[in-house]
Regions:
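Hydrophobic, small-residue-rich transmembrane alpha-helices and their short perimembrane loops
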Residues: 1-109, 116, 120-133, 141-143
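Interfacial loop-to-transmembrane junctions
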Residues: 136-152
Length: 152
C-alpha cells in the first residue's frame, strides 16, 4: 500500500530525500551541540523543535520557489520535456520530510521529557536513531528508483 502510494508520486522523491536528509542532519547537529554543552533535555527539545520549524519552513519555501522558477524557465524555453510537478506539492513534500525525519534525532529527548522515560544515553540513542533514519531514506529511494538497496 505504501509502496504503491510512493510509486504514484515518485516525481517528488527528490524533495523527500533532500528534506529528510537535511532535516535529520541539521537536527542531529543541534542535538550534538546541545548534548556536548550538557544542556538540559528541555533546552535540547526547544532548540531541536525551533530548528525543525524554521529550517523546515525555509526548505519548503525554497523548494517552492525553485520549482516555480524551473516552471517559468520551462515555459520560456518550451523545450524542456521533463515534468517537474506542482511547486506547492514539492514544497509540502520537502517540508513534511524535513519534519518527519528531522524529528528522529530528538526522539530520545522527547521520550524523556514528555513520556518520563529515563534514557541514560540519549545522545547515543540519537546517533542510532539517526542512522536508522538514513537507512529508511535509502530504502524509500531504492523502492522508487529500482536501484539496489546498498547503492541507494
Amino acid at each position: 500500500m505504501i509502496k504503491n502510494f510512493i510509486k504514484q508520486h515518485d516525481e517528488y522523491m527528490g524533495e523527500f530525500v533532500y528534506g529528510a536528509i537535511d532535516g535529520s542532519v541539521t537536527t542531529f547537529a543541534v542535538v550534538a551541540s546541545a548534548s556536548g554543552a550538557n544542556l538540559a533535555t528541555k533546552v535540547v527539545l526547544i532548540l531541536g523543535v525551533a530548528n525543525l520549524i524554521a529550517d523546515g519552513f525555509s526548505m519548503g519555501v525554497g523548494s517552492y520557489l525553485s520549482s516555480k522558477s524551473r516552471a517559468e524557465l520551462r515555459n520560456k524555453r518550451r523545450a524542456d520535456i521533463v515534468e517537474i510537478g506542482s511547486p506547492v506539492v514539492r514544497a509540502l513534500v520537502t517540508y513534511a520530510a524535513f519534519i518527519a525525519v528531522g524529528i528522529v534525532p530528538l526522539i530520545a529527548y522527547i521520550s524523556e521529557y514528555i513520556l518520563n522515560i529515563n534514557i541514560e544515553h540519549k545522545f547515543l540513542s540519537s546517533i542510532a536513531l539517526t542512522s536508522v533514519a538514513f537507512i529508511f531514506i535509502g530504502l524509500m529511494k531504492s523502492s522508487v528508483t529500482n536501484t539496489g538497496k546498498l547503492k541507494a
